Amino acid sequence: MSNPRMFQSRGKRVVSDSLPIANSTHTLEDTLKLRPDWTIALSQHETETRSTRTSCSTTTESTIAMRSKQKAIISVLEEFRDSEAAYVHDLHVAQRYYADRLSDRVKKSEWKDVFEIFLVLCKQASLFEIEMHKSLNDEINYILDDQDACLKPKPSVAQLFLSWLPKLSAVYGRYCVIQENIGKKVEKWMKNSSISEYLQECDSMAKIESNSWNLDSFLVKPVQRFLKYPLLLNQLYRSASLGIISDYVLLGEACHKSEIASQRMNELKRRRDIIITALDSVSNSQEVLLLSTDSIDKKIAKLQNSTNIFYVPEHEPILAFVHQLSSSYTNLLNLRSAICDWLKFSRYHYLKFFTFVEAYSVFCKDTKSADKWALISVALDNIAKGAVLRLTEQCQTSVLRPISNGILFFRNPLCVTDVWIKKATAFSKRRQSQVFEEDLESFPLLSNCLLEELPLFLEMARNVTDECILAFAQIQATFYDTIQKVLEPVVAKFNLTDHQDIPSIESIMDFTSLRSSMESSPKSK
């Protein structure tokens, strides 16, 4: 019985591949020379082994580096989260131990100057911290999760920050502008012995829950915190890389916009200092002259006709805004005068009308229509003494008072623009002669301030004017409707009146004049 074919082939291959061991004097090198295919196989095996070891080593190193990077990113995220929570905690401590407790200890106006915007900021910061705390925790969990990145829910710290940045910039910017005045108010309180002692008690209680030591240190925290956001975001951006942070591209945008917002806050403070300096340079006599004459228009025309005007940067848009400011101020004054005149003439008209009808009802007392004329007299009396007074009160509250406040708001912009015109004239002359003075160093910043702030102020002034005109139109409509409702019923009764028995107005007036002359003449003896 023969062996199966597979065993036969294996036996043949073994015999053909075997070398005589007894007579073998070959070394390993000789064997490899005889079988070059072995050399290739062994070299490939060594290469694969070496590459496997190298790849394992590289994978281990990259894993260690990735974990180290993740640890650094998580550390930054935790710092952001914990520092934001601590900051909001300090804001609430300041609210409890200072704002709430001082509300009945200091003047209401001073308390409002110090804490009004601070409390608004505290509310916004609390809402922001709640959302940011959750987003930062989600980002940390996203980094620690070993799932595939495409399967993970992607949080977005940068997107959340960008959505909040406009609101934060607005409230923090307002607070930054008045922060210096807040410090002066607190300094004034410290000079009052009773308030100072009470503040020390507040300090002692606040120190139990916070590391801040007095009210000043609490009130400066918002500005410090807002300026720290770019540092935290940049630190996170530098330590992160694409793929680790879910919104790495948006994170770069958040860094850029937060830096712009911080620069904007610093610029607002510098602008405020420039504006205060400009207002301080305007004396009371100059202000009265400025607000009561067309001196600004004359100065604008003189500056526009100057040959040196081209040396003033951005002079055309600024002069256009200044001209609009002056004309808006004049129009608002004229509007207030026109409304006051209309109220005066309305009161005068109905008072005279009532006086005439009352006198005429006396002349008609012996006629059938006497009672009806008496009703009209009463109705006109109600209009003259009731409806007109209500009209005046409504106009005073809803129209004239807002217009007067708007006119007062024009004071500072008009004074600042007057200072700018003077500096522009001096700047153009010094520019041509290449001689500069120290008081002109702030001129470019003042120009930038007018370029940005005047359009906003003019828009606000237009809105106030529109609201006042609409309110006045509604008050007028209500007044005329009241007159119609009061007069229509009594006047309608005259449609059925027989006027034949009513004496003519000429005969009545003649009789009255004759009687008056007889009473005034001396009696004969």
Curated annotation (Swiss-Prot):
Q: Which GO terms describe its cellular component?
A: cell division site; cytosol; medial cortex septin ring
A GO BP term here is: regulation of protein localization to cell division site involved in cell separation after cytokinesis
Cell division among keywords: yes
* Transmembrane stretches, start-end: none
Chain ranges of the DH domain: 72-268
Highest taxon of the lineage: Eukaryota
Q: Which InterPro entries match?
A: AH/BAR_dom_sf, DBL_dom_sf, DH_dom, Dynamin-Rho_GEF
What keywords does the record list, in alphabetical order? Cell cycle, Cell division, Cytoplasm, Guanine-nucleotide releasing factor, Septation
Question: What Pfam families has UniProt attached to this entry?
Answer: RhoGEF
Q: Which SUPFAM superfamilies match?
A: BAR/IMD domain-like, DBL homology domain (DH-domain)
Molecular-function annotations in GO: guanyl-nucleotide exchange factor activity
Q: Where in the cell is it found?
A: Cytoplasm
Q: What role is this protein assigned? A: Has a role in the control of cell polarity and cytokinesis. Involved in bipolar growth and septum formation.
Which PANTHER family does this chain map to?
A: NUCLEAR FUSION PROTEIN FUS2, SH3 DOMAIN-CONTAINING PROTEIN
Output this protein's name: Rho guanine nucleotide exchange factor gef3
Gene symbol of the encoding locus: gef3
